[in-house]
């Protein structure tokens, strides 16, 4: 789960530099997310990425295709069959799939193709301009908060759809106690679901925030009880992977507190 930024954003990162960093760290394979320009939502756009991978990657780099056209999270699903043999799976990472019927269509297709759906879970209508967790720190310091439901509501929906369709489903960077509970229960029912969290969600919470923006991330650092639930999820096997989700920004493009 990496963001190698090419094509479209090579001033932030390239496939060459990202794969070199991976090799230096001991990785032999990287999966790169589709928040690119053009987004890999058809064979032509995917080829723009795989041509660079073939030329510049120093280790095995596996692209993800998008779920929706232009990675919008709304509108139409892509033609999965046209690129399924050249991608690790499908994701709109950076954007949540907002429509239940779209996600059901996508999961139905991917179940037939034997491909995984890897989801960034975020309900746009619940963000309300927030940029840190909607907890005590946000209220005390008069900041706009992001509620936990904006994450877990889509996970709850998707686990149900994965159960209905038989799709293999992976949840990116979970951060809330509710997410852990939903996934734990889904696994107990036999749903084909896996998930990851980041090391920062296991080691910090919104009590660690300061007024210098140094811990700006999405999902945000949640409450102490969320951190504890994530730790318990790692220990009992509910959480399958601790993933760093590396993503490069330039100083000028680093999101400010008012943007997500």
Identify the meaning behind each predicted range.
Residues 1-5, 120, 173, 251:
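Histidine-centered divalent metal-coordination motifs
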Residues 54-66:
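A glycine-rich helix N-cap at a beta->alpha junction
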Residues 2-56:
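Metal-associated gating/positioning segment near the N- to mid-region
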Residues 7, 33, 64, 93, ...:
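Structural motif
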Residues 250-256:
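Conserved small/polar residues in nucleotide/adenosyl-binding loops
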Residues 68-72:
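Active-site beta->alpha loop and helix N-cap motifs at the rims of alpha/beta catalytic domains
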Residues 75-242, 247:
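Histidine/acidic residue-rich metal-binding segments in metalloenzymes
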């Amino acid at each position: 789960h990496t963001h190698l930024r090419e094509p479209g954003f090579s001033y932030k990162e390239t496939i060459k530099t990202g794969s070199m960093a991976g090799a230096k760290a001991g990785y032999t394979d990287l999966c790169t997310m589709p928040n690119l320009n053009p987004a890999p939502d058809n064979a032509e756009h995917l080829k723009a990425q795989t041509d660079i991978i073939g030329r510049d990657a120093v280790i095995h780099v596996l692209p993800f295709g998008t779920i929706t056209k232009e990675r919008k999270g709304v509108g139409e699903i892509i033609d999965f069959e046209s690129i399924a043999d050249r991608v690790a799976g499908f994701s709109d990472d950076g954007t949540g799939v907002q429509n239940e019927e779209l996600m059901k269509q996508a999961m139905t297709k991917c179940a037939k193709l034997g491909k995984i759906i890897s989801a960034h879970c975020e309900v746009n209508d619940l963000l309300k301009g927030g940029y840190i967790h909607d907890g005590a720190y946000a209220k005390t310091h008069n900041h706009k908060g992001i509620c936990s439901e904006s994450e877990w509501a889509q996970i709850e929906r998707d686990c149900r759809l994965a159960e209905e369709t038989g799709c293999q489903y992976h949840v990116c960077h979970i951060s809330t106690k509710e997410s852990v509970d939903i996934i734990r229960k889904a696994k107990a029912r036999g749903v084909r679901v896996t998930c990851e969290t980041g090391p920062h969600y296991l080691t910090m919470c919104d009590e660690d925030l300061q007024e210098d923006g140094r811990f700006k991330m999405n999902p945000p650092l949640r409450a102490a009880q969320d951190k504890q639930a994530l730790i318990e999820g790692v220990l009992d096997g509910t959480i399958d992977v601790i993933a760093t989700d590396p993503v490069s920004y330039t100083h000028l493009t680093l999101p400010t507190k008012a943007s997500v």
